[in-house]
Amino acid sequence: MAALAPVGSPASRGPRLAAGLRLLPMLGLLQLLAEPGLGRVHHLALKDDVRHKVHLNTFGFFKDGYMVVNVSSLSLNEPEDKDVTIGFSLDRTKNDGFSSYLDEDVNYCILKKQSVSVTLLILDISRSEVRVKSPPEAGTQLPKIIFSRDEKVLGQSQEPNVNPASAGNQTQKTQDGGKSKRSTVDSKAMGEKSFSVHNNGGAVSFQFFFNISTDDQEGLYSLYFHKCLGKELPSDKFTFSLDIEITEKNPDSYLSAGEIPLPKLYISMAFFFFLSGTIWIHILRKRRNDVFKIHWLMAALPFTKSLSLVFHAIDYHYISSQGFPIEGWAVVYYITHLLKGALLFITIALIGTGWAFIKHILSDKDKKIFMIVIPLQVLANVAYIIIESTEEGTTEYGLWKDSLFLVDLLCCGAILFPVVWSIRHLQEASATDGKGDSMGPLQQRANLRAGSRIESHHFAQADLELLASSCPPASVSQRAGITAAINLAKLKLFRHYYVLIVCYIYFTRIIAFLLKLAVPFQWKWLYQLLDETATLVFFVLTGYKFRPASDNPYLQLSQEEEDLEMESVVTTSGVMESMKKVKKVTNGSVEPQGEWEGAV
């Protein structure tokens, strides 16, 4: 490749090169976003995998929903010991809780168990066959597994690649025409059946299908691949390669049963966030004199959240209609989601530190928090994007999922530190009754602003010393008491904000997750409803607590503190401006007391 000719001077190329290097991480992220997952039409390719169990997918089915599984290639790198068993399992549950048989020891092999409540597909590559073992309740509670060579319900039974739509339509016709045949399946057929598979040089390929024909068969179905070793063989010496395609569909949507309402839910919540942002902008324009920089940052948050929800709804709409997202909409959603997450945690941390409310410069300790929170939040959002765009059965999926949980937990803990530090400063200021030697950042800011006003009135330093010396002791103690009361009131407000953040974290991270595990499969969308509702309530309450209005307890207390300083200075100095101190002389003696006399 020919070298590019240099353009411009070396001095001009330096900044351009540095700017280009700074853009490399963003370009890498965009390249990742440009390859989203295939939605509910899944394709997974594993090469030399050593895992004992691979979770291929989980999907909630309504009546007349179906799944088509096409194993294009499955090959083994067999060790010397042939005592190995591989196959698939199909589990059905009513919610997203953990299946009991999957929580066993790592050496536990479900394929070798005699009595199980799941459907098993056990492969025998040497004999080029697969055995289907169904539990006793398979006739009514579980659907029948159909192979393309068993019953010609998939249209072209001898071809491995089948159109999922035509397969579903043809199968539905077969079920309608042969309903009596399905209902009279003998016990032997429901117990165990064997089917031949295509073997091409040790790589087998086959296709199976099932249809949800009754209401009792509705549920959350999970498909797993298992590798069972004998005589405690090392797992790394026994690898497998798998190329599989899975198509899942409900009657009117490619979305899982619990995800079908999500597009409408996201659009509705986007409207409420947009409405709250509009109201907030109206408040800022109405109270311009009380607005700080942080208020405008808070205004950007609901609009960014609303845009993210709109693009998320569009993304789910295309997945629902065609089984995979449109890349452009997916990329836009991921970008807005990344911005929303970073902006949310930055805003929470800035409010906790009191930036713009009580101080305009962040301390070194505050800056360290932002140096931790911002990269962690970006990493958490990148992990979320990778999870959304990666198939569930890949090796990196579990790693990124665990990383997302850990990083998000660290972010939630880190944003609490600025609030705790502000509370500690206020406690120290309140404990000293407002004495100047231990004033917290709130009192310091009020005094600085009062001092700037004093300078604007052209008071000399000598006048300030005179005012301080002439201030009665009772006035000083009164001011100290008022300052302590102000600090206590601000301390109460920051404690409320701390509780508000903790409740937000609990509702969106813990309670919502427990709800997701507990509710039936068709109500899984309640998890997203609770998460979005809790976020909206958190936005509204935070805006109410720190609203730019004269009746805001936080801002009102700061204003009262400043007014107290100005009233003490301006009123006293205005009276004393034309006064002078004199001593009364009576019969040559000087009286100790003094009084004020007006200067003529």
From Swiss-Prot:
Residues 157-175 have a biased composition (Polar residues). The chain crosses the membrane at residues 264-284, 294-314, 338-358, 369-389, 403-423, 499-519, 525-544. GO terms for molecular function: clathrin heavy chain binding. Keywords: Cell membrane, Disulfide bond, Glycoprotein, Golgi apparatus, Membrane, Signal, Transmembrane, Transmembrane helix. It is found in: Cell membrane; Golgi apparatus, trans-Golgi network membrane. It is a multi-pass membrane protein. Cleaved by FURIN to yield two fragments of 17 and 35 kDa that remain associated via a disulfide bond. Glycans are attached at N70, N169, N211. Residues 1-39 form the signal peptide. GO terms for biological process: clathrin-dependent endocytosis. Belongs to the LU7TM family. Has been proposed to act as a receptor for neuronostatin, a peptide derived from the somatostatin/SST precursor. Involved in blood sugar regulation through the induction of glucagon in response to low glucose. (Microbial infection) Required for intoxication by Pseudomonas aeruginosa exotoxin A and Campylobacter jejuni CDT. May contribute to the retrograde transport of bacterial toxins, including cholera toxin, from the trans-Golgi network to the endoplasmic reticulum. This is Protein GPR107. It comes from Homo sapiens. The gene is GPR107.
